[in-house]
Amino acid sequence: MTARYIAIDWGSTNLRAWLYQGDHCLESRQSEAGVTRLNGKSPAAVLAEVTTDWREEKTPVVMAGMVGSNVGWKVAPYLSVPACFSSIGEQLTSVGDNIWIIPGLCVSHDDNHNVMRGEETQLIGARALAPSSLYVMPGTHCKWVQADSQQINDFRTVMTGELHHLLLNHSLIGAGLPPQENSADAFTAGLERGLNTPAILPQLFEVRASHVLGTLPREQVSEFLSGLLIGAEVASMRDYVAHQHAITLVAGTSLTARYQQAFQAMGCDVTAVAGDTAFQAGIRSIAHAVAN
């Protein structure tokens, strides 16, 4: 019989769990008990609750995300890059009887200090679904990952998503704004500005001035700012993009469309893989190996 196993995506604020029989998902569950929201419960107790009626004797559990951080269940040490894709699933951290945490990745050079935790699992899945020499993984912190067919060679992080949130919600740029609305035109205008002038520090206050003076509709500030930041990010990473034969974009639907537009404006073709699809493919491959 094909082995059963449980895959867990356990982040700071949420937990998602899947019960698999081979490659077939039997059931999935979600919880708001992220590692920073355990409400006094132990991680083991939360896991037992979420997987009630799932765990037969010795059913393996493989987890990824912030559960392996210093605020999680137990620190799963980072693997230093360069690192083979295969080594990620070979260096799991045990936290119980057949319960495992996937390690994160780190870079520590004079000119680059970086970490990732959770995205490494997406990378494994993305590599299987759309092999590439450059993986771009937008989100709160966008990861730019250089790889070949066997190993991850380097990565950088750009805090575009978090910066957008901070500027819109905790700076003068967003002070007193009405509810924001979608606007493809405002996003495109910001994108063009960011691509053409990636040094955005002098431009940020202009976003505020533009809506104060009425040249930018106040309801469209978020869209313009999003375009400005994404354009500046992609333009500033031109050297990372140069000479790449294939680019894989790993993200949800909304961010995929925004980054695709940015890459197309630079004349780059990309292949898109849904972030959730990549994560499940990656953690399934590791958990399946553990179970068998």
UniProtKB/Swiss-Prot annotation:
- Give one GO biological process term: D-galactonate catabolic process
Q: Which residues form a coiled coil?
A: none
Group of enzyme by EC: transferase
Q: In which pathway does it act?
A: Carbohydrate acid metabolism; D-galactonate degradation; D-glyceraldehyde 3-phosphate and pyruvate from D-galactonate: step 2/3
Reaction(s) the record says it catalyses:
2-dehydro-3-deoxy-D-galactonate + ATP = 2-dehydro-3-deoxy-6-phospho-D-galactonate + ADP + H(+)
Q: Provide the induction entry.
A: Part of the dgoRKADT operon, which encodes proteins for the metabolism of D-galactonate. Negatively regulated by DgoR. Expression is induced in the presence of D-galactonate.
For this UniProt record, the keywords arranged alphabetically read as follows: ATP-binding, Kinase, Nucleotide-binding, Transferase
User: A single Gene Ontology molecular function, please?
Assistant: ATP binding
The EC number(s) this enzyme carries: 2.7.1.58
Phenotype upon gene inactivation: Deletion mutant cannot grow on D-galactonate.
**Domain of life of the organism encoding this protein:** Bacteria
Q: Pfam families given for it?
A: DGOK (PF05035)
Protein family (similarity comment) = Belongs to the DgoK family.
User: Which named protein is this?
Assistant: 2-dehydro-3-deoxygalactonokinase
Organism expressing this protein natively: Escherichia coli (strain K12)
